[in-house]
Amino acid sequence: MALHPQAGRPHRDGSEAQAEAAAQDLGRLPSPSKVGAAVCRIQGLGHRAARRPRRGIGTTSASRVPRPGALMPATRNRPRFIHCRGQPPRTRVSSKRSKRSRIHPCHTEVPGWTHEKQMGSSVKERLRPELSQLDQDADDLEEEEAARLPVTSPDGLLMEGDKQPSPGQGPFFYIGGTNGASIISNYCESKGWQRTQDSHCEDYKLKWCEIKCRDNYCSFREGQQLLFQLPNNKLLTTKIGLLSALREHARTLSKARMLPSTQTKVLKMEEFFPETYRLDIRDERQAFFALFDETQMWICKPTASNQGKGIFLIRSQEEAAALQAKTQSIEDDPIYRKMPFRAPQARVVQRYVQNPLLLDGKKFDVRSYMLIACAMPYMVFFGHGYARLTLSLYNPHSSDLSGHLTNQFMQKKSPLYTLLKESTVWTMEHLNRYINDKFRKTKGLPRDWVFTTFTKRMQQIMSHCFLAVKSKLECKLGYFDLIGCDFLIDENFKVWLLEMNANPALHTNCEVLKAVIPGVVIETLDLALETCQKSLHSQKMLPLLSQRRFVLLYNGETTDLWPRLASSRPLNRLPNPNPNPNPNANPHPHPHPNPHPHPNPHPNANPHPPRPTCEAASSALSSARAAISERPGARKSMPSRGAPVCTPRKSRLSDSSGSSIAESEPSLCSGSLEGSRDTAREPSLGPPEEEREEEQRSTSHRGS
């Protein structure tokens, strides 16, 4: 039997004669309020086929009552809910539009209804128009209600399953955690952005998380989004990571100083970093316990912790022997050797600075900031912070850690903190006035020592640390990071770097912090936005309109041959307003940004020379790599993790003359560090084996 000519278009079949005939055969309509087994009596198919589940039809409920006059299949027993295995194909469930859930199945043939027989069933011809009419009525009702409802979802959030926001929504931002959340939220909302609570949202403009998550970096859209914290910033922000980076950098610089053409004075690690040993390495552990004596005090710290957690002092042979026995027993335990994730966190022991400079008899340190505003090219800044004081007077023989550690987490444990918390934080201006009054004449210090010598020394140390890890950091356009750096001043006014912290504390629980922290956060976001946009559109970085209090430490635009983005995705670059048809019009374009532009002598010359392309960078790198390979015993460079595929960066290689290997540290007498060139060119050798093991054990942490 041939199929009905209208069967291929069920939604357009309106034959009343067929509908009346089908209604007589199907019988009465089932009551949706009753519960029972719905059995369709179809001639020629048998009871087994009639009992088959109706996949693709969905479930029936009391809230979905058939329209009057709609045709339904006859049932012998009471109707019941039909159990469907899995979700029907191409089924869309409407949500948040009314209390009635409507299911729109695709018009496919389902078992037990219309295709039990492959060809020529008279039942099929009668049932198709009625089922099609039900679908058409539901679609009409759906469109009518949708036309009366607003398009946007509540609170401006993405509805479940949507990948892109509806017109008029977004951009979105996400904040994970409470550290500085109010400041960041107010900043983003002032720009018209909408906050989302969905941590898995991929359509965001800014994501600021306290704890790093691998998924954030896997779904990151380079050049389109901003993401707080570099993926492997632990090279700077963990004790072992910073120690290993400084040691490797020192070895590289010592080899460079052996060359006759490199006589530049560089900063030595022992000049600013206290003597430190790793307890997770047997040789270093034995060396420490061999040199320990009770005349010196040491401090033991976990490698990836902050807020003073897990820190204790070592002052006697008994304490040193107990620590040695504990570490040795753990290392020899076969259970912990087979279960690395249960092994205790790696630790370092650091020589305690026993003669710190005191403010009114209290120990203090200085929190400053290193901002990596852009990673392609690197734009690194220094920012002033504040001084942190202890509540109690300094006593080197005291066992109370609150007198040795200055962070707010430790000071809050004191019962006097609520009354005296304002005295635990000083502004840099307050510190400068105090040192001018108390120590300028007695110590022979220059005027405003805090803002001259001390500030330049902090900038020099930060630059040294950044250059030690620059070739290993994972960089993508849109990554940015704010790192808290803690400095200590001893009574001889020597500056020591204690540690660097990821996700620095941004709380504002006292007046000084209320005056300092918001400015740091706002300028951080401003610089991250501006540098990202300028890099994306191939514009000169300098001058930066959003730069106010931060000082530029490193400008990768003038020192690195850096590629734009991966060649797999082109960028939307700004058109050149002044094309240069004559290739000889400007034969010597200067690639360095000039904050004081001069008139262009050639009207057709391009005032903004193009940046080095991937091909030009590859050519320069090939010649440099060939020169290196000719030297006896030269090591071949390894590709950097996270670097784009198109070309490696020249900053990881040294030229044939060797002049670029010498590190150019900012001088203490220099007036500005802007545009300081990075001439340290060492191959990226990757982290050592013990550092890779520590990477698996280290975990993210909250602000300190």
Curated annotation (Swiss-Prot):
Coiled-coil stretches noted in the UniProt entry, renumbered to this chain: none
Record-level Gene Ontology MF annotations: ATP binding; metal ion binding; protein-glycine ligase activity; protein-glycine ligase activity, elongating
Residues involved in ATP binding: K301, Q307, G308, Q350, R351, Y352, V353, K363, F364, D365, T406, N407
Residue stretches making up the TTL domain: 169-540
Feature type site, description Essential for specifying elongation versus initiation step of the polyglycylase activity: Q307
Enzyme class: ligase
Protein name: Protein polyglycylase TTLL10
Annotated source species: Mus musculus
